[in-house]
Amino acid sequence: MKLNDKELSKIVGGNRWGDTVLSAASGAGTGIKACKSFGPWGMAICGVGGAAIGGYFGYTHN
């Protein structure tokens, strides 16, 4: 089965909490990558901070 452009434009899914989780995971990954040079503790702190920021924006964008 193939979907055309019209059908693809009408796909709706997810919710606020799902967006929050995905954004938090993405923010954590970005934070960890950004702070690799600061060692494991720096990566942990940046990962938590990135998750908090990503989760906040994922939750409030709706």
Swiss-Prot record:
Question: One Pfam annotation, family name?
Answer: Bacteriocin_IIc
Propeptide residue ranges?
1-14
One GO biological process this protein is involved in is:
killing of cells of another organism
Q: Give the residues annotated as coiled coil.
A: none
In the UniProt record, does the keyword Glycoprotein occur? Answer: no
Q: Which domain of life is it from?
A: Bacteria
Q: Does the record bear Repeat in its keywords?
A: no
Swiss-Prot/TrEMBL keywords? Antibiotic, Antimicrobial, Bacteriocin
Q: Function, please?
A: Heat stable bacteriocin active against Enterococcus faecalis and other Lactobacilli.
Give the record's subunit note.
This bacteriocin depends upon the complementation of two peptides for activity: LafA and LafX. Associated with a 180 kDa bacteriocin complex.
Q: Which family does it belong to?
A: Belongs to the bacteriocin class IIB family.
Name the UniProt record assigns to this protein: Bacteriocin lactacin-F subunit LafX
Question: Gene for this protein?
Answer: lafX
